[in-house]
From Swiss-Prot:
A motif (Cx9C motif 2) lies at residues 87-97. Its main location: mitochondrion. Residues 101-146 are annotated as: Disordered. This is Mitochondrial intermembrane space import and assembly protein 40. One of its GO terms (molecular function) is protein-disulfide reductase activity. A motif (Cx9C motif 1) lies at residues 64-74. It is found in: Mitochondrion intermembrane space. Central component of a redox-sensitive mitochondrial intermembrane space import machinery which is required for the biogenesis of respiratory chain complexes. Functions as chaperone and catalyzes the formation of disulfide bonds in substrate proteins, such as COX17 or MICU1. Required for the import and folding of small cysteine-containing proteins (small Tim) in the mitochondrial intermembrane space (IMS). Precursor proteins to be imported into the IMS are translocated in their reduced form into the mitochondria. GO terms for biological process: mitochondrial disulfide relay system; mitochondrial respiratory chain complex assembly; protein import into mitochondrial intermembrane space. The CHCH domain contains a conserved twin Cys-X(9)-Cys motif which is required for import and stability of chchd4/mia40 in mitochondria. Monomer. Can form homooligomers. One of its GO terms (cellular component) is mitochondrial intermembrane space.
Amino acid sequence: MSYCKQEGKDCIIFVTKEDHEAPSNAELVEDDPNDPYEDHGLILPNGDINWNCPCLGGMASGPCGQQFKDAFSCFHYSKEEIKGSDCVENFRGMQECMQKYPELYPQEDDNDSAPSGGANTAPTDSLPASSTDSTAAAATENPATS
């Protein structure tokens, strides 16, 4: 006998072997050619925000989705001379939420713009002279053998 167990927002469906082996009777729904969310960008023709836009990268869903929607909506509809200046509290709320989930919303470091060698790679011209001299000397004293 199949049954569903609700755990928070998730519904876990348990099926028997017989249910699993039986042919599916699910009906596939064709895409609606009049779907107002289909083939549009971030802003719908009526000026509303398209929360289904892949350009949002899933930010509108997830644990901080509502905070993101509140902040983004506030900014989008802001009439202030400095657009969004009335939305500071919304963005703070979103930031506080995101800090609770660092694995989902990693912080960007200032070192993200470091050269491709990585943040810990220092150019040789910034090393003390004795350091570069000893490195060069070591390279000439112990040539690599093939």
